[in-house]
Amino acid sequence: MPEAQSRFRRRLLLYYGLFTLGLFGFVGMMGLLEKSNADALWLGYVFLFITIAIYACIGLICRTSDLNEYYVASRRVPALFNGMAIAADWMSAASFIGLAGILFASGYEGLAYVMGWTGGYCLVAFLLAPYLRKYGGYTIPDFLAARYGNGKPGGNLPVRAIAVLAASLCSFVYLVAQIQGVGLVVTRFIGVEFAVGIFFGLAGILVCSFLGGMRAVTWTQVAQYIMMIVAFLVTVSMIAWKHHHEALPQLSYGTLLSQLDAREQQLEREPAEQAVREYYRQQAILLQERIARLPDSFAQERDALDARLQDLRTRNAPLRDIKSLERERLEFPRDPAAAQQQWNQQRADALARSRHSLSSTEPYPAASEQERKTKRLNFVLLVFCLMVGTASLPHILTRLYTTPSVKETRNSVAWAVFFIALLYVSAPTLAALVKFEFFQHLVGTPYAELPQWVVQWRKVDPPVFGIRDVNGDGIVQWAEILLQPDMIVLAAPEIAGLPYVISGLIAAGALAAALSTADGLLLTIANALSHDVFYHMVDRQASHQRRVTTAKIVLLGVALFASYVTSLRPGNILFLVGAAFSLAASSFFPVLVLGIFWRRTTAAGAVAGMAAGLGVAVYYIIVNYPFFTRMTGIFGNRWFGVDPIASGAFGVPAGFAVAIIVSLLTPRNAPVIDRLVSYLRKG
């Protein structure tokens, strides 16, 4: 067996080495085509379609109906390649697209994501990885049902049921974020509408996972990791070399950051910049007056908007103006309560733009000491939620089942940290490089001479980039630029003036990041529903073939529903990902840790703990996140000023407390559970 595993590893090294060489050759060939004046749009098509075709071929080659292959890739994935697959599973659209963007927009505060996501793997390696692999199984609900099952065949059904619900919910929220990332990439680089881009992405996701399950997903994820890391590192190095003559800008990040800080301070002192911020200060005052006059102001603003729209139609105004006003009318609040919520948010945005821009180096910038304390609290709690969420995500933990041994599992986590760090040490550098490009080549530019990339990105729907001459001086000011952080990485090659082939490469990398995570998430949901619900709760006599077929049908249904939800545009990518982490942490972290390290934890305690943790986190998000408050009309107060993305800060303690209290109030577990815990922790 060791010799066979060694031959298998050498064969994989050869295959993926050739794939990497082929990737560089393909990029070089596309560069030559661009130099020969090939259409840039067609280059974008080729990059996206060729890479998806490669993933589809791997998925087709790895198709299987074997149960072990479909659920856990026969538990024979070597540590090196499982580390790459974990990294690809982990480095979602949020990491690839969103991380550099949030560092660009928020500066120091964005480091919470780097610290939380990286630190979480320490918890995985020391608290969970060896014990879950030693148990085996197919899903996380499998482990929980057995640990809290008191030796019953099939384990404890209530524990399994609530674990399936929690796994499906947090994975589904995360899945929506990935499909949204795919839609953004496709919309920009192929030029289709966002809804069409979503279903294009759906096809890409399904070709990787539908036929081969975990086996197909594992080997496509290895290829996708290579694609995304090559795309990211090449882009960072080329931007740095073109403008700063450095091939490894990560080593001089501190110097670049000092230059940025000096430029930011200079901008804040310029009169034109101050005039723009004064405009937004006045807008905030007007919105406050409008809020104070509710509900009368609601009817007045609605009627005024209707009158303007009717006037445009009567005068046969340009269709663009009519469409813009129709969109504004469609987004107008439906009642005074919703108006108050929306105008409060707009007032907060205007106030934020009226203040000094966020420094790249200043921790917790704020106008008052109380606001600074609130920001510090949110920073710390977000790091906490991301760390424990990392250690609780079902699609990551399931990968621990795919290695040949406990030792290989530990090694694969170590490799995963290394592969993830390659991107994470480069993301802050890319954010700084792109911001430097903004300061050098956009801020201070006449509006009549805007670069072509600005024109292109202003056309993207939903809007991700906007710029308006607020003070009427005809010159772009820093405060006049409004952008979604998600566009920074995708636009980076164009902003830096690199060849379009690099834009195609970064788009292919972003697509790989979204597809790799989406595949893992989709498989987690489908396997939980087919294995834990269908097999364990509906039909215990189902054949292996029927179970795999059921998993494929469920996978297709979940993918279609997730695409529909994504088309509703529920929020930015980074918030959805953060919410998924809080939900996973609140529901799974307490019962996993207690289940391994405290023998006294009972099934009743586990059910109550998961329900309490998940319930608290879901409630806090629903009553505080604008997308849900607009839908439900329910508005809540933020506890201690904590953002809804960090709802796990309340859910995790609630889960621990309830699980411990209920366990102490209920009878002890059967001796078989004590023996199971001893076995897991032995050696």
From Swiss-Prot:
<keyword id="KW-0406">Ion transport</keyword>
<feature type="transmembrane region" description="Helical">
    <location>
        <begin position="548"/>
        <end position="568"/>
    </location>
</feature>
<dbReference type="GO" id="GO:0005886">
    <property type="term" value="C:plasma membrane"/>
</dbReference>
<feature type="transmembrane region" description="Helical">
    <location>
        <begin position="495"/>
        <end position="515"/>
    </location>
</feature>
<feature type="transmembrane region" description="Helical">
    <location>
        <begin position="221"/>
        <end position="241"/>
    </location>
</feature>
<dbReference type="InterPro" id="IPR019899">
    <property type="entry name" value="Na/solute_symporter_VC_2705"/>
</dbReference>
<feature type="transmembrane region" description="Helical">
    <location>
        <begin position="377"/>
        <end position="397"/>
    </location>
</feature>
<keyword id="KW-0812">Transmembrane</keyword>
<feature type="transmembrane region" description="Helical">
    <location>
        <begin position="162"/>
        <end position="182"/>
    </location>
</feature>
<dbReference type="InterPro" id="IPR001734">
    <property type="entry name" value="Na/solute_symporter"/>
</dbReference>
<keyword id="KW-0472">Membrane</keyword>
<feature type="transmembrane region" description="Helical">
    <location>
        <begin position="603"/>
        <end position="623"/>
    </location>
</feature>
<feature type="transmembrane region" description="Helical">
    <location>
        <begin position="573"/>
        <end position="593"/>
    </location>
</feature>
<keyword id="KW-0813">Transport</keyword>
<protein>
    <recommendedName>
        <fullName>Uncharacterized symporter H16_A2524</fullName>
    </recommendedName>
</protein>
<feature type="transmembrane region" description="Helical">
    <location>
        <begin position="84"/>
        <end position="104"/>
    </location>
</feature>
<keyword id="KW-0769">Symport</keyword>
<dbReference type="GO" id="GO:0015293">
    <property type="term" value="F:symporter activity"/>
</dbReference>
<feature type="transmembrane region" description="Helical">
    <location>
        <begin position="110"/>
        <end position="130"/>
    </location>
</feature>
<feature type="transmembrane region" description="Helical">
    <location>
        <begin position="645"/>
        <end position="665"/>
    </location>
</feature>
<dbReference type="InterPro" id="IPR038377">
    <property type="entry name" value="Na/Glc_symporter_sf"/>
</dbReference>
<feature type="transmembrane region" description="Helical">
    <location>
        <begin position="194"/>
        <end position="214"/>
    </location>
</feature>
<dbReference type="InterPro" id="IPR050277">
    <property type="entry name" value="Sodium:Solute_Symporter"/>
</dbReference>
<keyword id="KW-0739">Sodium transport</keyword>
<comment type="similarity">
    <text>Belongs to the sodium:solute symporter (SSF) (TC 2.A.21) family.</text>
</comment>
<feature type="transmembrane region" description="Helical">
    <location>
        <begin position="12"/>
        <end position="32"/>
    </location>
</feature>
<feature type="transmembrane region" description="Helical">
    <location>
        <begin position="413"/>
        <end position="433"/>
    </location>
</feature>
<dbReference type="Pfam" id="PF00474">
    <property type="entry name" value="SSF"/>
</dbReference>
<keyword id="KW-1003">Cell membrane</keyword>
<feature type="transmembrane region" description="Helical">
    <location>
        <begin position="41"/>
        <end position="61"/>
    </location>
</feature>
<dbReference type="GO" id="GO:0006814">
    <property type="term" value="P:sodium ion transport"/>
</dbReference>
<keyword id="KW-1133">Transmembrane helix</keyword>
<keyword id="KW-0915">Sodium</keyword>
